[in-house]
């Protein structure tokens, strides 16, 4: 793909990430970002990070376990726990290390982890590091989930782990049915809200809140690198679970803590999310507009119910070609190929932010229609 000039990765951005970015000196429409709330370039979020660096320095030079706990880490944890409706929360330096560190602590030999086969790679790595038996069910197939639960020893721990919003396809977990099966088989549930936080539920509290099932979900995970305009992640649960994780999650104990700037920026973004409900309204306005326009234009967009819109190509090379030709037209989108999806499900991922306009969506769809027709995909 490099020789053909269609290698689509590591493209350099020369400034802030907003709805438009500068790349190679040219204006490019950004539809490849996870910044759903549109806060990565917000002056208040930036200033909060700058002020924290001035107060605390550039880094913590230690683990949370030792010298790396700042008062703003604890403040962010308290506010996140209240926001998602759990007793306590624990912050990690990245979202990936939440899943890869927390999951191995929750089950042991003779226990079971049951995952959707489209769950994020960090969940996959987390379950690989556990000593439990790992089962998976077909994507959002509740009959298959029940079949996997029936294989489990009824007396063992059974942990169902699921993405609230699936990061490539944009569809939601069938949380009401998962909760019903949890009770039927005496299981527990962990929901990864990486792409649900800031998007679904009251004030963007996530998919668990959207379904009104926060109290039925045992652990809620989230990241700061998407709607909270920073980097890092957290797990929220009952006090006893958080205390156990504090003293056992290796990625928490043996990693340096999140930087002051990252922590303060996430905290400020969380405040803005709660103070500006119109941000969420704007996101859903432009999302619904884009969904309608893509369907009218004949694109295959699957079962998405979110600002993540998959444009199915179903061919790896053509997926790369779409990405390259769209970029040449001034539209940044992301290619999704195996192992992030099945070989027959390759797609380009088009994602929206709260500050995208209808005009930007129209321009992008016009250019993508041209590209898809050029490759005989429309």
PLM feature spans:
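Active-site C-terminal subdomain of aminotransferase-like
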Residues: 185-188, 195, 200-305
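Active-site phosphate-binding strand-loop segment of PLP-dependent enzymes
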Residues: 135, 139-191
């Amino acid at each position: 793909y490099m020789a053909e000039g269609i290698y689509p990765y590591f493209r350099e951005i020369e400034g802030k990430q907003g709805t438009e970015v500068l790349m190679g000196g040219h204006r490019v429409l950004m539809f490849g970002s996870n910044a759903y709330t549109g806060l990565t370039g917000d002056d208040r979020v930036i200033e909060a990070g700058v002020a924290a660096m001035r107060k605390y320095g550039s880094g913590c030079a230690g683990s949370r376990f030792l010298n790396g706990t700042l008062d703003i880490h604890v403040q962010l944890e308290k506010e996140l726990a209240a926001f998602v409706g759990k007793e306590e929360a624990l912050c990690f330096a990245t979202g990936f290390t939440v899943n890869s560190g927390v999951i191995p602590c929750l089950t042991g030999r003779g226990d079971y982890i049951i995952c959707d086969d489209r769950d994020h790679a960090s969940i996959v790595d987390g379950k690989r590091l556990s000593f439990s038996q790992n089962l998976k069910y077909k994507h959002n197939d509740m009959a298959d989930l029940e079949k996997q639960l029936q294989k489990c020893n009824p007396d063992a721990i059974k942990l169902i782990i699921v993405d609230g919003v699936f990061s490539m396809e944009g569809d939601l977990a069938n949380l009401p049915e998962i909760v019903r099966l949890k009770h039927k088989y005496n299981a527990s549930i962990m929901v990864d809200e990486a792409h649900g936080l800031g998007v679904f539920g009251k004030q963007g509290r996530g998919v668990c809140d959207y379904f009104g099932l926060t109290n039925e979900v045992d652990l809620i995970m989230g990241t700061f690198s998407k709607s909270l305009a920073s980097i890092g992640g957290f797990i929220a649960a009952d006090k006893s679970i958080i205390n156990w994780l504090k003293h056992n999650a290796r990625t928490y104990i043996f990693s340096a803590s999140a930087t002051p700037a990252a922590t303060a920026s996430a905290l400020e973004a969380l405040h803005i999310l709660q103070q500006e409900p119109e941000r969420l309204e704007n996101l859903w306005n432009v999302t619904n507009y884009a969904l309608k326009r893509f369907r009218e234009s004949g694109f295959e967009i699957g079962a998405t119910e979110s600002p993540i819109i998959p444009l199915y190509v179903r061919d790896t090379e053509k997926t790369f070609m779409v990405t390259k030709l769209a970029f040449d037209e001034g539209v940044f989108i992301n290619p999704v190929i195996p192992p992030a999806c099945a070989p027959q499900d390759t797609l380009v991922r088009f994602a929206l932010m709260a500050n995208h306009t209808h005009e930007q969506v129209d321009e992008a769809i016009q250019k993508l229609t041209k590209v898809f027709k050029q490759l005989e995909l429309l």
